Amino acid sequence: MKKYILSLDQGTTSSRAILFNKKGEIVHSAQKEFTQHFPKPGWVEHNAQEIWGSILAVIATCLSEADVKPEQIAGIGITNQRETAVVWDKTTGKPIYNAIVWQSRQTAEICDELKEKGYSEMVREKTGLLIDAYFSGTKVKWILDNVEGAREKAENGDLLFGTIDTWLVWKLSGGKAHVTDYSNASRTLMFNIHDLQWDDELLDMLTVPKSMLPEVRPSSEVYGETIDYHFFGQNVPIAGVAGDQQAALFGQACFGEGMAKNTYGTGCFMLMNTGEKAVASEHGLLTTIAWGIDGKVNYALEGSIFVAGSAIQWLRDGMRMFKDASESEVYASRVESTDGVYVVPAFVGLGTPYWDSEVRGAMFGVTRGTTKEHFIRATLESLAYQIKDVLCAMEADSGIELKTLRVDGGAVKNNFLMKFQSDILDVPVERPVINETTALGAAYLAGLAVGYWKNQDEIKEQWHMDKRFEPTMEAETSEELYAGWKKAIEATKAFK
């Protein structure tokens, strides 16, 4: 009987189930979008029950359409939108509030208070993160402080917290496994990335009871099995978990120190593997856990850019400049340059290395001769400039010079953007054959745990390149363009 690995990719806007075979190829996939809730400006929430429903739906669709029986699944890997926080009742299994999404700014005031109390240095040292509404810790505190009776229930040990991976493992296992992996734990603001434990000092700071927290385990091991009534009568090992960006790093086979990938999704996330050492950042990067496997923990430096693919969506839906995102490449290629136009897409502030949530988007250098084509090109170029900002910070922090950048995500189909990215970074950009690297990474982690794949060397052999973009731009030109971007950033920051 032919066996497969099932990868569950629970993202910000949709849930997907993807079946992989022994060669790391996609056999079939199914996708289902779910509702985004915006109760107040800057707030973003999801219904965790709806997410769970979407996962059950895509599993059923994927298996039936592929004509694969549940007993043919050797293991399940889970990858997830990170930082998004769910708090649920241990007994009823029902969330006590919507999941607060990573993008949501509703805990910004809590963060300001913590900074004023002087916690920043301690948080940075222990977690590798900044005090920011982006991470899970303040979201949990907000739920406990704002949902009636929640704090009392939490103190009594009646509530459980989890990032989305934890929620899904708990549901799939019928409430038997309350676990997370190192990569997801490292994004909560409550986990010490050096001694690999939930940290009492951080929990006191956030007033979160320890009894709510999941057990932290490696990213590749069997956490439990599916309870039969959630998996067509089968007990399948749930065997791999990693946050989406770390899973993509693993799926891109960036196993060596200094290897890096950039994912172009809603936002952009660039991670560089720093091996078994946690490199502290002096340049606004995050130090995070890449994965834990074979008794070892790998660390990474991460740069987070809040607006990437969503800038292209904005051109399409908000500005109505084209009907399909793929047209952006056509328009951008019609002009030789932006004619000095810069777009800074700070719609929800700026991430790495600026970390300024107050700034908003801006546009510079506009003349009467500026056209739609210039505007679209400038928006695409802004994605590449933001990655350059991140790379400069990474090289400064790690002392490692990047040799090539592996890329994935929706926008990598845009050849104009990939070529410009290579030019502005002055390094080759490699696009893989399988772009679903996030789901692939989770599949690999699960497959290794159940012996479906032997080791990381076998996985490395499966990475194949679709196209390599080489830099051809004169250094002087790219430096000039980047200097203009830096000026645009300064001007944007001045306007608040």
UniProtKB/Swiss-Prot annotation:
Binding-site residues, glycerol: 82-83, 134, 244-245
Activity regulation remarks: Activated by phosphorylation and inhibited by fructose 1,6-bisphosphate (FBP).
Positions bound to ATP: 12-14, 266, 309, 313, 410
Taxonomic lineage from the root: Bacteria, Bacillati, Bacillota, Bacilli, Bacillales
Pathway: Polyol metabolism; glycerol degradation via glycerol kinase pathway; sn-glycerol 3-phosphate from glycerol: step 1/1
Subunit organization: Homotetramer and homodimer (in equilibrium).
Binding-site residues for ADP, renumbered to this chain: 12, 16, 266, 309, 410, 414
Gene giving rise to this polypeptide: glpK
Post-translational modification (record): The phosphoenolpyruvate-dependent sugar phosphotransferase system (PTS), including enzyme I, and histidine-containing protein (HPr) are required for the phosphorylation, which leads to the activation of the enzyme.
Record SUPFAM superfamilies: Actin-like ATPase domain (SSF53067)
Family to which this protein belongs: Belongs to the FGGY kinase family.
GO cellular component: cytosol
GO MF annotations, alphabetized: ATP binding; glycerol kinase activity
Modified residues (Phosphohistidine): 230
Enzyme Commission number(s) of this protein: 2.7.1.30
Organism field: Bacillus anthracis
Keyword line: ATP-binding, Glycerol metabolism, Kinase, Nucleotide-binding, Phosphoprotein, Transferase
Name assigned to this protein: Glycerol kinase
GO biological process: glycerol catabolic process; glycerol metabolic process; glycerol-3-phosphate metabolic process
Reactions catalysed, as given in the entry: glycerol + ATP = sn-glycerol 3-phosphate + ADP + H(+)
Described function: Key enzyme in the regulation of glycerol uptake and metabolism. Catalyzes the phosphorylation of glycerol to yield sn-glycerol 3-phosphate.
